[in-house]
Amino acid sequence: MFRGANAINLDAKGRLAMPSRYRDELDSRSAGQLIVTIDAVDPCLCLYPLSEWELIEAKLRDLATFREENRRLQRLLIGNAVDLELDGSGRFLVPPRLREYARLDKRVMLVGQLNKFQLWDEDAWNALADADLAAIQKPGAMPDELRDLIL
């Protein structure tokens, strides 16, 4: 499982270094093979171990293709998916088109989301995190089922 937010640097060639604390798990789960695609809701990228992405693909494949919204989601997620592999230094190359989509510049946030990571522009991530915290702290903003989750 992937947890935590990590500030990492995008180098001049468009590569990011995976923090060492995640490398062993990625190696054991998918031999360092990853899939990156757009997030269809937020202006970020989703980075999956290959084994996890294959589960997503199976669900997408099973969607009824006569529904336009299903085809749209398939086009967005599968059409933008790119195979990646960690190199010997634990780095991976983010394709230019995907970097542009997420507005990734020098400073990037790698955010663990249990079964995947999100890649955010650092400023966008910080603004979203601040907005999320402010929204959840408003009286009555949290549904009862979520309130029970908070320790």
Swiss-Prot record:
NCBIfam families: division/cell wall cluster transcriptional repressor MraZ. GO terms for biological process: negative regulation of DNA-templated transcription initiation. It is found in: Cytoplasm, Nucleoid. Forms oligomers. Its main location: cytoplasm. Keywords: Cytoplasm, DNA-binding, Repeat, Transcription, Transcription regulation. Residues 5-52, 81-124 form the SpoVT-AbrB domain. One of its GO terms (molecular function) is transcription cis-regulatory region binding. This is Transcriptional regulator MraZ. Belongs to the MraZ family. Coiled coil: none annotated. One of its GO terms (cellular component) is nucleoid. It comes from Pseudomonas savastanoi pv. phaseolicola (strain 1448A / Race 6).
